[in-house]
Amino acid sequence: MDLALLRTFVTVHRAGSFTRAAALLGLSQPAVTSQIRTLERQLGRPLFLRQARGVTPTTIGDELAHRAAPHLDALVEIAESGLDDDSSSRTLYLAGPPEFTTERVLPALTGLTGDDGQGLTLRVSFGTAEETLEGLSCGRHDLAISTTRPRGALLSATPLCDEEHVLVAAPRWAERIGADTVRLKGAPALDDLPVVEVHESLPFVSRYWASVFDCAPAATGTVIVPDLRAVLSCASAGAGLAVLPRYLCARALEQGAVVTLLDPVVPPLRTYFLVVRTGTLALPHVARAHEWLRHAATAWC
């Protein structure tokens, strides 16, 4: 059986689409379709059911993928191991949310770039979870940081760390509300405070309210700015309350620029995932960065 046909088959199985598999393989869609049909003729069985959007593997397709994929990944690892001495000089294409990537991920990965300029080179893109996972699926990125665990066989996700969300405001707002008022009265104590958020839907505030107060926020956004660092700056300047990751506002809390309005027994958490295309950890530079970040993240929690 032709290994090239098996490689195409496994890629289609993971991608769930001839179009996406063609992009990952650097082939035309007709070429991918032709290779799958050739393999199906050789086996005498259909491997995929064609759907309106993508393809679904048949039982024999799932069985073949289960048997073939680990061996193909091992062959890739063997082939790439010859590049191991040079893998430090290869380029890693990384994508993730701007704040977490800037504050946590990039400082950690600089340890792989090398003092002599001969280490790993980085190319970084920022985007939403949907954008970064789509880019990873299409082959634009090697590694993605996401707060959404991807579905399907194409992408493999590893939990990286949990970030704690904190309800903060400038000290004058805390003084205006009064000590322990939020703890005693709950969400209504905050109804008249302006809100600083990253989006009109108030994703951070809504998640916090649902988790801690078991209700939706009554207020709308007073300042909407699509960057958590800008949200912190606005909150520090007195623009209103905000819900922020603790790692991002820790220094501002230490300096007294903002204060916590409530310290719940169980604070809201959000999980970050380290995501790769299934099988690409056989590539030394991807595996090295993946392991490096997993180790670094043990100090982030």
From Swiss-Prot:
Matches recorded under SUPFAM superfamilies: Periplasmic binding protein-like II, Winged helix' DNA-binding domain
Keywords linked to the UniProt accession: DNA-binding, Transcription, Transcription regulation
Regions recorded as binding DNA: 18-37
Any Pfam family the entry gives: LysR_substrate
MF-aspect GO terms: DNA-binding transcription factor activity; transcription cis-regulatory region binding
Domain of life: Bacteria
Disulfide bridges in this chain: none
Known role: Putative regulator that may be involved in stimulating antibiotic production in S.antibioticus.
Family recorded in the similarity comment: Belongs to the LysR transcriptional regulatory family.
Name the UniProt record assigns to this protein: HTH-type transcriptional regulator AbaB
Native source species: Streptomyces antibioticus
Recorded name of the encoding gene: abaB
